[in-house]
Amino acid sequence: KKELRQYFSSMIGFVFLAFFLVIIGIYTWAYNLSGGIGNFEETLGSISFLFVILIPILTMRIVAEENHQKTNQLLYTAPVSITKIILGKFFAVVSLFGIGILVICLYPLILNMYGTDVRLSLAYSSIIGFFLLGTACIAIGMFISSLTESQVIASVVSFITLLLTFLLSNITGMLPTEAISQCVMIAVLWLVICLVFYHMMNNVTVLVMMAVIGEAAIWIIYAVKSSLYESLLTNILNTLALSTRFDDFSLGILNYDAIVYY
């Protein structure tokens, strides 16, 4: 309740909803009403890039502000578990996002009223996928916000992370698939992961152990069976791509794998 109240007392909530709905309204008018096309799912697919811009703004202060003001120490000693506190913050952001989604649910009905033939099953399946995609982006933004005390850093890193996530399917197509290239990229990625854990735990011993054991395992596996690395990172990144899983929802397919993934 506190987090949700702060969104509307600081105008962030109103600005988010206004910008979110105005952009969707413009796309709906241009594509569905003016164009006379009933594929509302394609409209949602076209504006999913909004998450890259809007979600970092919503989540940048959600945990970073607590870290900056040192009020996170009070949260640790509260009678409520940390899990419940984080879930409370998460559901506060999701509730704000959900208000916008509820408004969007009216769009297919309005389009039908104005003579645009909308396939409601596809439209509402896409809305479900759009909502789940948004909640996944919110979770990423919250995690990044928890790693820093600076709202600006949280916002910028969230923006870059979400942008890369949305571009993963394009990026993987440009990566070399040879075993040695994939192995080197995995080794570098592991070092980045170790640095993230170090930032969270601030423990040099854990950092060194993770880095040494991980790097040793990566190169030993390559020496034993290098063929395992052929296209390995490419396949992993394709699996992690958020936006590609939205495609099934656009086709009216409620893919349980995608639902669980989000």
Predicted regions located by residue number:
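Alpha-helical transmembrane segments and their helix-entry boundary regions
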Residues: 13-14, 85, 153-155, 259
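Helix-loop interface residues and adjacent transmembrane-helix termini in multi-pass membrane transporters
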Residues: 8, 79, 147-148, 253
